[in-house]
């Protein structure tokens, strides 16, 4: 497809890299020549220097023949206006990044009235992901499918866990409840496991299971868990505001430390149930005074990756807390594997996942096997996709054991009218099902792509 991206920032560049990898024709628009030069040195794209809200600039970028226009500049207003002009100029699909909390309340009205195909709020989406991690403190990552009926949860197998040295095939019979191990990361290697694979101490495993069974499973297999009652957040930006709102509704005690006095005053008015502390979150004495040692969860959400890493390492040292760190520039896998700071979230990757899901659904619009959900796991080396199943000869009605599936691919879960099935070889896919596929084959666009 022909895709135009307005904005060469972190999100735009990350998205452009993936779209080019999936063989789309990408053109960038930005007013900053140095950013355009940088992106041209990284990926094979066309670039236009100019204002994306000006019709002549859009025309030069090829808007009349574009399939999709994505606006991810730093300005919500520019994103919305450029999408409106792009829609009028070519009737293409339009995607806008909209971050202002004032717009967030009316986003469905804005989307409908402006004819937007999709809106994405990275700060809100990241706050929701962090809230999931706080809900399941034993997890390193939580992704949801089937309208939140099914979850893929990543755990670290600790020393002393009964899972260590157990075959994957034996796990289901050894413990009560329903869960399936679908991905293993071991010493930088990704394994889509067969039943013969033996689990090891230190493995990162991604497990499909219902949320209600997580605590019971963790206790049975020796993974430490706890009930989080209070949360300390470093940084008082928009993401912290969204997160505090979510946590307040869940009756968590929240404390935000913010350096800017005016921002503190604003947050105090917006978040009456949250304690707002004016001060420098990198000041260890202040953290001690605010009793960081007693906090159940510490979330580093300042605007600087380096500060967030420092804060998380300090929290790990002085508090027995669930540790969550926001990273946007530094390579995520280096942080999570080398520094072991806890759970790492990246707004640019969350945004990219969301938009890629829409792009692949567009490509597959002529087929009914559409992508409902897409997550990229393990430093983007694994994809977990949820497909809606339509009647497909050679695929539907055939026992799974008789399908010629690609290697390094696993059908993890079937949702049949709200009934969640952990599939065996004797199960079949039926029209109307949704199915979760986990694979190292990146870029699947339709369900039939799972076949050799």
Language-model segments: residues:
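Cytosolic regulatory regions of ion transport systems
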Residues: 1-452
